[in-house]
């Protein structure tokens, strides 16, 4: 019997609610597929601030390092916005990524056939969308030095940031994208701004160099402004999108809305070795917390992504994804997906229960 240790970070807002659903689903898959999941819950984000004064306690980080995978629900709350930056929940997430040496964010965007009408775009535009955004996570303008603010008599207040990438940083994220592309349609679109930015010129050079090791992969390039337009005009043209931290932050959120709800989207943050962090794209949604209104499907799909990418439990992952499609195909919806009120509306717990029934063939 396969055995895996998972650190579960339930976090803030709707995090505990969707975590309960994820644990029940793992229990169902454990029984069906003879897999042992040892789940260790640890405080993180605002939850950890309340308990320890820190968003990422050392004990939590150590548990994550000792795990096979980390499953994160959601963090953040406006009540922490006035704290010093290093004590906010979001800084805890940055420190977790740094502590686990995670540099690649993988965000799949797939249109589930039962939800085509939920998208704000026409069905003929989005019906075949199945793409993945591979975003570099630890370099670029968010981390470049120098950065800061200064006051001058001539110009008044002045702020500055530095966008910088090295060969090594580009090469390793490119390898992630090319390896992923080999398991898909063998197409990569690298997004940059090489017409005006030196850092993007280096990015393009290194990505072209990386392709030499993958002659069967079709590589194209788009400037980020054009790519933003193409994602809305013809999103099905994309297979794997490779891009830098800043551009990926923007492009991945735009791509997220192709599905009609951010409550449907999983993601993974990966390094070269060690455990990855698997989490929904959505935030902690404190306005609907504790009301049984949250859509747990992004958390459930993150669990499936963890099973496939982090734990190599391919059959269990496919089983879970098929169960989700089966439930959606029956017309069950959480409130964020029930726009036309023609489907059966479920709460967070009830949606989880229906997916467990589908796993068990009911």
Swiss-Prot record:
> EC number(s) in its UniProt entry?
1.1.1.85
Q: Which residues are listed under the site Important for catalysis?
A: 142, 193
Residues given in the record as substrate binding sites = 97, 107, 135, 225
- Stored SUPFAM superfamilies: Isocitrate/Isopropylmalate dehydrogenase-like (SSF53659)
Q: Which UniProt keywords apply?
A: Amino-acid biosynthesis, Branched-chain amino acid biosynthesis, Cytoplasm, Leucine biosynthesis, Magnesium, Manganese, Metal-binding, NAD, Oxidoreductase
Q: Which GO terms describe its cellular component?
A: cytosol
UniProt binding sites for NAD(+): 283-295
* Compartment(s): Cytoplasm
Q: Which reaction does it catalyse?
A: (2R,3S)-3-isopropylmalate + NAD(+) = 4-methyl-2-oxopentanoate + CO2 + NADH
Amino-acid positions noted as binding Mg(2+) in the UniProt annotation, renumbered to this chain: 225, 249, 253
Q: Which cofactor names does the annotation list?
A: Mg(2+); Mn(2+)
Query: What GO molecular functions are on record for this protein?
Result: 3-isopropylmalate dehydrogenase activity; magnesium ion binding; NAD binding
| Enzyme category, top tier | oxidoreductase
Q: Which InterPro entries match?
A: IsoCit/isopropylmalate_DH_CS, IsoPropMal-DH-like_dom, Isopropylmalate_DH
* Quaternary assembly: Homodimer.
Family according to the record: Belongs to the isocitrate and isopropylmalate dehydrogenases family. LeuB type 1 subfamily.
The protein here is known as 3-isopropylmalate dehydrogenase
Give the organism, scientific name. Answer: Prochlorococcus marinus (strain SARG / CCMP1375 / SS120)
């Amino acid at each position: 019997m396969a055995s895996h240790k998972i650190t579960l970070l339930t976090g803030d807002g709707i995090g505990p609610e969707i975590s309960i659903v994820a644990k029940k689903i793992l229990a169902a898959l454990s029984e069906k597929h003879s897999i042992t999941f040892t789940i260790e819950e640890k405080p993180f984000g605002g939850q950890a601030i309340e308990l320890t004064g820190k968003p990422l306690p050392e004990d939590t980080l150590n548990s994550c390092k000792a795990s096979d995978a980390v499953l994160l629900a959601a963090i953040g709350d406006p009540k922490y916005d006035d704290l010093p930056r290093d004590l906010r929940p979001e800084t805890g997430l940055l420190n977790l990524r740094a502590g686990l040496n995670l540099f690649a964010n993988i965000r799949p965007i797939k249109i589930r056939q039962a939800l085509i009408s939920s998208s704000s775009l026409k069905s003929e535009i989005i019906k075949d969308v199945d793409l993945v955004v591979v975003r570099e996570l630890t370099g670029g303008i968010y981390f470049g030095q120098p950065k800061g603010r200064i006051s001058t008599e001539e110009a008044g207040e002045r702020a500055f940031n530095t966008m910088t990438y090295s060969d090594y940083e580009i090469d390793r994220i490119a390898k992630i994208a090319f390896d992923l592309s080999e398991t898909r349609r063998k197409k990569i679109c690298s997004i940059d701004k090489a017409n005006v930015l030196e850092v993007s010129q280096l990015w393009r050079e290194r990505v072209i160099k990386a392709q030499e090791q993958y002659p069967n992969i079709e590589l194209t390039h788009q400037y980020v402004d054009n790519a933003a337009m193409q994602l809305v005009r013809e999103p099905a043209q994309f297979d794997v999108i490779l891009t830098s931290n800043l551009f990926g932050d923007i492009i991945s959120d735009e791509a997220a809305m192709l599905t009609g709800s951010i409550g449907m989207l999983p993601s993974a943050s990966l390094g070269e070795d060690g455990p990855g962090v698997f989490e929904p794209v959505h935030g902690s949604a404190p306005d609907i917390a504790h009301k049984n209104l949250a859509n747990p499907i992004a958390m459930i799909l993150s669990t499936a992504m963890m099973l496939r990418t982090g734990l190599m439990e391919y059959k269990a992952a496919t089983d879970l994804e098929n169960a989700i499609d089966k439930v959606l195909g029956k017309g069950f919806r959480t409130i964020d997906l029930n726009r036309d009120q023609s489907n059966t509306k479920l709460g967070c717990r009830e949606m989880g229960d229906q997916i467990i029934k589908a796993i068990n063939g009911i």
